[in-house]
Amino acid sequence: MKKLNDKLQLIQKEMAQNIPVDILNAFGQSLHELIEQNLEDRALKVGDIAPDFTLPDAEGLPVSLYDTLQHNAVIISFFRGNWCPFCMAELTHYQEAINNNLVDSATVIAISPQSIHFNHDLKVQNNLEFRILSDKGNEIADKYGLVFTLQENIREIYKNMGADLELFNSDNTYKLPIPATYLIDKNKKIVFSSVSTNYMERADVCDIKL
């Protein structure tokens, strides 16, 4: 199974080759500004009790964290949306891990602020077997300390590249979650966390000690 970091580096290389320099520079400046805000400091950490939630999955069915924890530990991945190639690489990485029986002792759940039908399309088009939940308004991501507001100059760039956040998320707040991965044990405690303002960095399944 290919390392997730290898996939992420390949995406960066492709972006450098195909995206105009001025846009790459804008992305770089945006990321630098967000990193300087130390957004990760607000996020829940190892040892914290994970807040419960009930969110609709890609079929509109409610999924409760605490109910799920009665049966298994839970891996939660907060991601930005199916318009983000780094997010897509992460989600397909988790599906590969499931296919290779690497996460049998945990239930994988992915959460994004986008609407249910976009999560449904994502799941069907990529043959994802795990639950993908819609966190409208980033309500749950905010409880986990992960929410930030995208800078105004980046919003139009995203839209021109096909990432119309008002359309995907059905709101005009331009709020997104910092990509984050948590492992929560059956006692509701966070036992692994990976949170990074740099959306090009993600936790590999091999980093999670199940």
Q: Model-predicted segments: where are they?
A:
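Structural microenvironment flanking redox-active thiols in thiol-disulfide oxidoreductases
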Residues: L91-K143
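A short local loop/turn or secondary-structure capping micro-motif enriched for an aromatic residue
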Residues: H71-A73, Y199-R202
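Short active-site neighborhood of thiol/selenol oxidoreductases, capturing the structured segment around
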Residues: L65-Y94
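Histidine- and aromatic-rich ligand-binding microenvironments
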Residues: R131, D204-I208
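N-terminal targeting signals for export/organelle localization
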Residues: M1-I49
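Short, contiguous, helix-prone interaction/anchoring segments in small proteins
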Residues: I35-Y66, V74
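Thiol/selenol-based redox catalytic cores and closely related redox-interacting motifs
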Residues: D135-E201
